[in-house]
């Protein structure tokens, strides 16, 4: 059984800490066995993965609909759903073996979480999940691609929240112009969980502003970037 960082985990998950523990055990066992998590990550599972994901709940309002793009083993979506049961969390993942893992975990933990197999750039996914309040991601792709995938899923003024590493400011500088051309506004780097984690999680936040950018991308013949 994996051991949580007691004070931080208790503060973040409260009475749902047992659910977080069960999810961490899923990651440490089936997650490793199925190749969704490297075995070397087990010893730092809580601070690097579970808590690092859950703390971005600081940036989400009550009852918001949140799409986790490229959810993989459920990060950051499942820790968010456990810590914030008020959120409407959708896990979006294209690979069948990962979708099956996510469905098993959601069922076992009794979470009100939707698992969708697909890619963010697919028209059917955009039609199904468009108008969401937030699109979250973790270790999925560079910011230009994340913006292409995230903006069409968001309502006007919705937010993209991308968990990144210490190079986040450099990546923002590199991709800001492309991001803004795709409809992203107020792009900034925000630390999350400073009261619980050292270092805190680093999150790139961008608001969906000009709706013309994302809408142009629905048709691959138009300028503005067809889905990658």
UniProtKB/Swiss-Prot annotation:
Residue numbers spanned by region Disordered: 207-228
Protein species of origin: Mycobacterium marinum (strain ATCC BAA-535 / M)
The entry's keywords: Cytoplasm, Methyltransferase, rRNA processing, S-adenosyl-L-methionine, Transferase
Major localisation: cytoplasm
Positions of S-adenosyl-L-methionine binding: 70, 75, 120-121, 138
GO CC list: cytosol
Pfam families noted in UniProt: GidB (PF02527)
Superkingdom as given in the UniProt entry: Bacteria
Protein name: Ribosomal RNA small subunit methyltransferase G
Function: Specifically methylates the N7 position of guanine in position 518 of 16S rRNA.
Enzyme Commission number(s) of this protein: 2.1.1.-
Keyword Methyltransferase among UniProt keywords: yes
InterPro entries cross-referenced by the UniProt entry: rRNA_ssu_MeTfrase_G, SAM-dependent_MTases_sf
GO MF annotation, one: rRNA (guanine-N7-)-methyltransferase activity
Keyword match Transferase: yes
Protein family: Belongs to the methyltransferase superfamily. RNA methyltransferase RsmG family.
Cellular compartments annotated: Cytoplasm
């Amino acid at each position: 059984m994996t051991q949580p960082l007691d004070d931080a985990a208790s503060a973040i998950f409260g009475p749902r800490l047992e659910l977080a523990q069960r999810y961490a055990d899923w990651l440490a066992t089936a997650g490793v066995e199925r190749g969704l998590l490297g075995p070397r990550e087990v010893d730092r599972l809580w601070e690097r993965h579970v808590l690092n994901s859950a703390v971005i709940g600081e940036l989400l309002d009550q009852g918001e609909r949140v799409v986790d793009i490229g959810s993989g083993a459920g990060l950051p979506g499942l820790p968010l759903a456990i810590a914030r049961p008020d959120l409407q969390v959708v896990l979006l993942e294209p690979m069948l073996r990962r979708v099956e893992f996510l469905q098993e975990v959601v069922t076992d933990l009794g979470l009100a979480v939707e698992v969708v197999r697909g890619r963010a750039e697919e028209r059917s996914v955009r039609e199904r999940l468009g108008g969401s309040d937030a699109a979250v991601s973790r270790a999925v792709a560079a910011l230009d691609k994340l913006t292409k995938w995230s903006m069409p899923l968001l309502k006007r003024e919705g937010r993209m929240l991308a968990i990144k590493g210490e190079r986040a400011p450099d990546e923002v500088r590199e991709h800001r112009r492309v991001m803004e051309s795709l409809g992203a506004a107020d792009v900034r780097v925000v630390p999350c969980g400073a009261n619980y984690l050292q270092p805190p999680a680093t999150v790139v936040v961008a608001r969906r502003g000009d709706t013309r950018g994302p809408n142009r991308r629905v048709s691959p013949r138009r300028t503005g970037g067809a889905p990658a």
